[in-house]
Amino acid sequence: MDNYQLRSQYQIAACWSLVGSVTLSVDVKNGLTFNGSIPACPGVYKLCVQKTLCAYIGEGQNLLKRINNYANAGWIEKATKEFTNRRIQGWLLKELRDGNSAEIYICTEAFISKSGCNEKQLPFDNKYNRLIVESLAINDLQDDWTLKNKVKKIKHSLTIEK
Protein backbone atom coordinates (compact mmCIF):
# COMPACT_ATOMS: atom_id res chain seq x y z
CA MET A 1 0.00 0.00 0.00
CA ASP A 2 1.34 3.42 -0.96
CA ASN A 3 0.57 6.33 1.33
CA TYR A 4 0.50 9.77 -0.22
CA GLN A 5 0.63 12.76 2.10
CA LEU A 6 -1.22 15.77 0.76
CA ARG A 7 -0.32 19.35 1.65
CA SER A 8 -3.28 19.59 3.99
CA GLN A 9 -4.12 17.16 6.77
CA TYR A 10 -5.47 14.62 4.30
CA GLN A 11 -3.73 11.38 3.38
CA ILE A 12 -4.55 8.93 0.58
CA ALA A 13 -3.64 5.24 0.75
CA ALA A 14 -3.62 3.31 -2.55
CA CYS A 15 -3.55 -0.51 -2.71
CA TRP A 16 -1.42 -1.78 -5.65
CA SER A 17 -1.39 -5.42 -6.84
CA LEU A 18 0.62 -7.25 -9.46
CA VAL A 19 -1.92 -8.70 -11.91
CA GLY A 20 0.14 -9.91 -14.83
CA SER A 21 2.93 -9.50 -17.32
CA VAL A 22 3.45 -8.46 -20.92
CA THR A 23 5.23 -10.84 -23.30
CA LEU A 24 6.15 -10.98 -26.97
CA SER A 25 3.97 -13.21 -29.07
CA VAL A 26 4.73 -14.47 -32.56
CA ASP A 27 1.15 -15.40 -33.44
CA VAL A 28 -0.32 -11.98 -32.65
CA LYS A 29 -0.17 -9.29 -35.34
CA ASN A 30 1.57 -6.63 -33.24
CA GLY A 31 3.52 -9.04 -31.03
CA LEU A 32 2.13 -8.21 -27.56
CA THR A 33 0.30 -10.55 -25.20
CA PHE A 34 -1.01 -9.60 -21.76
CA ASN A 35 -0.86 -12.48 -19.28
CA GLY A 36 -2.74 -12.54 -16.01
CA SER A 37 -6.18 -11.56 -14.82
CA ILE A 38 -6.94 -7.90 -15.34
CA PRO A 39 -10.39 -6.99 -13.98
CA ALA A 40 -12.98 -5.12 -16.04
CA CYS A 41 -13.44 -2.42 -13.39
CA PRO A 42 -12.38 1.21 -12.89
CA GLY A 43 -8.89 1.84 -11.54
CA VAL A 44 -5.33 3.07 -12.02
CA TYR A 45 -2.53 1.00 -13.58
CA LYS A 46 1.27 1.01 -13.76
CA LEU A 47 3.38 -0.55 -16.50
CA CYS A 48 6.76 -1.46 -15.01
CA VAL A 49 9.92 -2.85 -16.58
CA GLN A 50 12.41 -5.09 -14.76
CA LYS A 51 10.23 -4.88 -11.58
CA THR A 52 11.69 -1.49 -10.67
CA LEU A 53 11.29 1.08 -13.43
CA CYS A 54 7.73 2.31 -13.50
CA ALA A 55 7.40 3.50 -17.06
CA TYR A 56 3.78 4.53 -17.45
CA ILE A 57 0.87 5.24 -15.14
CA GLY A 58 -2.68 5.65 -16.40
CA GLU A 59 -6.30 5.33 -15.38
CA GLY A 60 -9.41 3.90 -16.94
CA GLN A 61 -13.10 3.17 -16.41
CA ASN A 62 -12.48 -0.43 -17.53
CA LEU A 63 -8.91 -1.61 -16.82
CA LEU A 64 -9.21 -4.73 -18.99
CA LYS A 65 -10.23 -2.72 -22.07
CA ARG A 66 -7.76 0.08 -21.37
CA ILE A 67 -4.73 -2.19 -21.01
CA ASN A 68 -5.75 -4.36 -23.97
CA ASN A 69 -5.86 -1.18 -26.10
CA TYR A 70 -2.06 -1.20 -25.99
CA ALA A 71 -2.03 -4.59 -27.72
CA ASN A 72 -4.56 -3.38 -30.29
CA ALA A 73 -3.13 0.09 -30.94
CA GLY A 74 -4.57 1.72 -34.02
CA TRP A 75 -8.08 0.36 -33.59
CA ILE A 76 -9.38 3.21 -31.44
CA GLU A 77 -11.48 6.07 -32.80
CA LYS A 78 -10.08 8.89 -30.65
CA ALA A 79 -6.83 10.29 -32.03
CA THR A 80 -5.30 11.18 -28.64
CA LYS A 81 -5.84 7.71 -27.19
CA GLU A 82 -4.58 6.11 -30.39
CA PHE A 83 -1.36 8.15 -30.20
CA THR A 84 -0.81 7.14 -26.56
CA ASN A 85 -1.61 3.51 -27.35
CA ARG A 86 0.87 3.39 -30.22
CA ARG A 87 3.56 5.17 -28.20
CA ILE A 88 3.23 2.79 -25.23
CA GLN A 89 2.90 -0.24 -27.53
CA GLY A 90 6.10 0.74 -29.35
CA TRP A 91 7.93 1.29 -26.09
CA LEU A 92 6.77 -2.10 -24.70
CA LEU A 93 7.81 -3.89 -27.90
CA LYS A 94 11.27 -2.31 -27.76
CA GLU A 95 11.78 -3.19 -24.08
CA LEU A 96 10.64 -6.79 -24.57
CA ARG A 97 12.78 -7.25 -27.69
CA ASP A 98 15.76 -5.97 -25.67
CA GLY A 99 15.19 -8.85 -23.24
CA ASN A 100 13.50 -6.90 -20.45
CA SER A 101 10.38 -8.06 -18.66
CA ALA A 102 7.26 -5.93 -18.20
CA GLU A 103 4.64 -6.20 -15.46
CA ILE A 104 1.23 -4.67 -14.85
CA TYR A 105 0.20 -3.37 -11.42
CA ILE A 106 -3.28 -2.07 -10.70
CA CYS A 107 -4.99 -0.10 -7.98
CA THR A 108 -8.74 -0.69 -7.72
CA GLU A 109 -9.28 0.90 -4.33
CA ALA A 110 -7.90 3.82 -2.40
CA PHE A 111 -8.77 5.41 0.91
CA ILE A 112 -8.69 8.99 2.13
CA SER A 113 -8.36 10.06 5.76
CA LYS A 114 -7.94 13.31 7.64
CA SER A 115 -5.07 13.23 10.15
CA GLY A 116 -5.13 9.42 10.05
CA CYS A 117 -8.76 9.23 11.27
CA ASN A 118 -12.12 8.57 9.62
CA GLU A 119 -10.79 6.58 6.66
CA LYS A 120 -13.21 6.56 3.71
CA GLN A 121 -12.99 4.69 0.44
CA LEU A 122 -12.55 6.78 -2.71
CA PRO A 123 -15.05 5.44 -5.26
CA PHE A 124 -13.20 4.81 -8.52
CA ASP A 125 -16.44 5.11 -10.51
CA ASN A 126 -15.66 8.82 -10.23
CA LYS A 127 -12.99 9.77 -12.79
CA TYR A 128 -11.67 12.57 -10.55
CA ASN A 129 -10.83 10.11 -7.78
CA ARG A 130 -8.87 7.98 -10.27
CA LEU A 131 -7.08 11.09 -11.55
CA ILE A 132 -6.08 12.04 -7.99
CA VAL A 133 -4.48 8.63 -7.38
CA GLU A 134 -2.87 8.66 -10.85
CA SER A 135 -1.38 12.12 -10.23
CA LEU A 136 -0.09 11.16 -6.78
CA ALA A 137 1.51 7.99 -8.17
CA ILE A 138 3.20 9.98 -10.95
CA ASN A 139 4.48 12.56 -8.46
CA ASP A 140 5.80 9.75 -6.28
CA LEU A 141 8.07 8.41 -9.03
CA GLN A 142 11.78 8.93 -8.53
CA ASP A 143 12.94 7.73 -11.95
CA ASP A 144 13.48 10.08 -14.88
CA TRP A 145 11.56 8.23 -17.59
CA THR A 146 8.17 9.82 -16.96
CA LEU A 147 9.75 13.19 -16.25
CA LYS A 148 11.65 13.17 -19.55
CA ASN A 149 8.56 11.94 -21.37
CA LYS A 150 6.41 14.78 -20.02
CA VAL A 151 9.10 17.42 -20.64
CA LYS A 152 9.51 16.40 -24.30
CA LYS A 153 5.92 17.52 -24.93
CA ILE A 154 6.64 21.07 -23.74
CA LYS A 155 7.87 23.23 -26.62
CA HIS A 156 9.61 25.97 -24.65
CA SER A 157 12.56 25.50 -22.32
CA LEU A 158 12.12 25.30 -18.58
CA THR A 159 14.09 24.44 -15.48
CA ILE A 160 13.05 21.49 -13.35
CA GLU A 161 14.25 21.28 -9.78
CA LYS A 162 14.45 17.91 -8.09
Regions found by a protein language model. Name each.
Residues 1-44, 49-55, 61-162:
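Boundary/linker segments flanking structured domains
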